[in-house]
């Protein structure tokens, strides 16, 4: 009954944990061929199908050994990944073979450093030095009969970047790794699901054409409604003009969608409808060029839910199953269909949904990651339209490697990238940015004229403001927003102003649930014309939908000033000349923090040069050009590109070190769960008894705050 017929990749057990007969096991040949074929299909979009196929075939080669057979029967663990890595280098050499070896050796442990030191992980050089029969098990020659390998292997059609050619090879390795690990996961999942007679809810999404049909229907219905809206009052007339302008912007963008794939900008002022315009362009561009999905990348977790909800709405009955919302705070409890919940939960692992809405942290850290769980999705980024919302928010200290990744996606992976913002960063070569983006196409109609038509505020720098000055203005203006640069300043100012009617305080030391309740109260008071004085940190600039007649902003970068201006006269109901954004210099005690000092200094220069229109496209371009010039090497202060260049000749890329260094948010903070209400208390109590806490922790995200790891114990 238990006669051994072959070597096996996976054993099978009954419900009691007893081994089933071999006929239920997955043979190693079956698994290796399946993974090779699936990896090849994943890599086809970027022309690397043959390399991916052979990588898949070799990934578990070390299982062709008695040692691993013993492991399947309860023995000790065995290194089954190094064997395939060694064979790849022996067969295909130190270029393509070595890139394959990184993937094969790391398909469980993660991509290692090529040489030097590794953090609890052997380097590839150390792995390749291991000897068959001594350090790793001897292979049964049966593998050569079951796994057919070509003598030669053509390199994929990789157009290496002229200035950073080795970056292209490292990027390709991560893409190849993605194809391998996703194929390995999926074939293993399919085997065990079949064994247990379980259906796996993957795939079966609506296609982009169906989504575009629903999207266009929604837009056309909206246009019909606004065409019939009254235009009697001044506010109604302004709203009608605004909606006509939004339609013109959207139509113009869609007309540009036939252009060749590559890099685009959408430079539209706040209120110009860039969210729907960018999606309209992306859907048409994808249709014209046979692209596979749209990935919408947002810098703020706080607004990702609102954007994802808007997309579900415009896609109608297809929205819930088409839109994958992938970020740390996503709670699938708001989805109605249980099958859809399961499918999207699985889709978050590899991003195979047609519409992905995610954070910039998730997107870019994955592109530089070393772990299989983070890299698994990468191959599904290829062939996508990628919308970078609020592109100016990309972190300055990682800007150069991020730009290099964007270039790589456009050049070698059939992607188009739309940089979408009201304050377009001057990262093009034509703006003087050294080795910046080239051939970038603007899809908005005449951005300079748009900014004139959509001007809603008057921005002024009013000099230094003492506490007394700020308190006087808060007392004088019943509805106003004051934004400062740190939580201590916000709290201190609030303590002195809280005697005023309708005074609120918002910082990240309040959990999201608490902030959400306060914002609802704030919006209600603003709508009803009641006193509403808000003192907040920059968190309120992150797409929060509030509309004040007056905003004061402590000195910061011009992009932050523009975000603050988006909270003033947001609905365009007041004339711009009566809607003020006042920039001020705080007292020395609350001066600009060091990390914002350069941005604030350059903003002051722009305020001097463009005092008549500080948020004009010319002012923004001048601001970013000067800022990037001053920052220089700090635009890659983790030396990510240097690490690629220094190790490129030998292809000994330090993948593990790069992944560790590429952090868009430094992890000097720790989450603290706040028992804010009965729901939070119930969830916290459930944690004590839960076997799997991942789902509970996601539900608790709205009740967490981030505090420094070195905070006093009184916090906890």
Task: List the model feature ranges, each with a label.
Residues 1-225:
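Accessory nucleic-acid engagement/destabilization modules that flank
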Residues 10-15, 301, 324-338, 485-488, ...:
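Conserved helicase motor
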Residues 260-282:
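Walker A/P-loop
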Residues 291-314, 330, 426:
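Conserved Walker A/P-loop ATP-binding site and its immediately adjacent core
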Residues 317-368:
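Inter-Walker segment of RecA-like/P-loop motor cores
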Residues 360-364, 374-409:
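SF2 helicase catalytic motif II
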Residues 410, 468-477, 483, 488, ...:
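C-terminal helicase lobe and adjacent C-terminal extensions/tails of nucleic-acid helicase motors
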Residues 422-475:
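Interdomain hinge/linker at the junction between the two RecA-like core domains of SF2 helicases
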């Amino acid at each position: 009954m238990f006669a051994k017929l072959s070597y096996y990749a996976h054993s099978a057990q009954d419900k009691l944990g007893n081994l089933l007969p071999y006929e239920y096991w997955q043979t190693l040949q079956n698994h290796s061929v399946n993974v090779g074929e699936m990896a090849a299909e994943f890599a086809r979009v970027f022309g690397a199908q043959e390399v991916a196929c052979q990588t898949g075939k070799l990934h578990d080669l070390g299982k062709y050994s008695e040692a691993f057979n013993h492991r399947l029967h309860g023995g000790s663990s065995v290194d089954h990944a190094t064997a395939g890595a060694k064979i790849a280098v022996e067969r295909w050499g130190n270029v393509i073979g070595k890139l394959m070896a990184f993937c094969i050796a790391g398909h469980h442990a993660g991509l290692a450093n090529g040489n030097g030191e590794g953090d609890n992980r052997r380097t590839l050089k150390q792995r390749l030095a291991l000897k068959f029969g001594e350090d790793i098990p001897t292979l049964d020659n049966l593998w050569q009969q079951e796994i057919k390998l070509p003598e030669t292997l053509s390199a994929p059609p990789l157009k290496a970047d002229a200035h950073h050619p080795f970056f292209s090879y490292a990027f390709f390795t991560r893409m190849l790794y993605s194809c391998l690990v996703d194929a390995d996961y999926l074939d293993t999942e399919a085997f065990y699901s079949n064994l247990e007679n379980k259906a796996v809810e993957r795939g079966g999404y609506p296609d982009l054409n169906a989504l575009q049909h629903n999207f266009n229907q929604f837009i056309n219905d909206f246009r019909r409604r606004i065409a019939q809206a009254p235009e009697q009052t001044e506010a109604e007339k302004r709203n009608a003009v605004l909606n006509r302008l939004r339609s013109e912007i959207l139509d113009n963008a869609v007309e540009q969608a036939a252009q060749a794939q590559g890099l685009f900008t959408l430079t539209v002022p706040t209120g110009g409808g860039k969210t729907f315009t960018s999606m309209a362009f992306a859907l048409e561009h994808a249709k014209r060029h046979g692209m596979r999905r749209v990935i919408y990348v947002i810098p703020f977790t706080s607004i990702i839910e609102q954007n994802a909800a808007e997309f579900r709405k415009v896609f109608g009955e297809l929205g819930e199953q088409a839109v994958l919302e992938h970020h740390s705070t996503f709670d699938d409890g708001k989805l109605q269909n249980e099958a859809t919940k399961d499918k999207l939960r699985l889709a978050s692992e590899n991003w195979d949904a047609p519409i992905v809405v995610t954070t910039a942290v998730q997107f870019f850290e994955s592109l530089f990651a070393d772990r299989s769980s983070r890299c698994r999705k990468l191959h599904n980024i290829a062939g996508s339209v990628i919308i970078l919302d609020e592109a100016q928010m990309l972190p300055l200290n990682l800007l150069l490697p991020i730009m290099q990744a964007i270039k790589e996606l456009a050049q070698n992976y059939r992607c188009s990238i739309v940089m979408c913002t009201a304050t377009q960063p001057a990262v093009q070569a034509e703006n003087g940015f050294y080795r910046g983006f080239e051939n970038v196409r603007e899809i908005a109609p005449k951005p300079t004229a748009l900014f004139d038509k959509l001007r809603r505020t008057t921005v002024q720098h009013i000099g230094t403001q003492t506490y007394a000055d700020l308190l006087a203005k808060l007392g004088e203006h019943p509805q106003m927003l004051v934004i400062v640069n740190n939580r201590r300043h916000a709290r201190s100012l609030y303590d002195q102003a809280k005697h005023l009617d309708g005074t609120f305080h918002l910082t990240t030391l309040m959990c999201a649930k608490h902030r959400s309740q306060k914002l609802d109260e704030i919006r209600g008071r603003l709508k009803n014309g009641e006193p509403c004085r808000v003192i907040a940190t920059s968190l309120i600039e992150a797409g929060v939908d509030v509309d004040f007649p007056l905003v004061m902003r402590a000195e910061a970068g011009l992009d932050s000033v523009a975000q603050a201006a988006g909270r003033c006269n947001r609905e365009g109901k007041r004339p711009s000349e009566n809607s003020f954004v006042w920039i001020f210099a705080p007292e020395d005690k609350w001066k600009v923090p060091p990390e914002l000092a350069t941005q604030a200094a350059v903003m002051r220069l722009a305020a001097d040069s463009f005092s008549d229109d500080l948020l004009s496209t010319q002012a923004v371009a001048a601001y970013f050009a000067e800022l990037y010039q001053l920052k220089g090497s700090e635009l890659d202060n983790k030396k990510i590109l240097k690490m690629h260049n220094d190790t490129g000749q030998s292809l000994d890329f330090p993948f593990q070190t790069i992944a560790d260094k590429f952090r868009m948010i430094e992890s000097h903070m720790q989450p603290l769960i706040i028992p804010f209400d009965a729901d939070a208390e119930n969830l916290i109590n459930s944690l004590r008894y839960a076997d799997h806490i991942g789902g509970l922790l996601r539900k608790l995200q709205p009740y967490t705050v981030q505090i420094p790891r070195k905070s006093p114990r009184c916090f906890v």
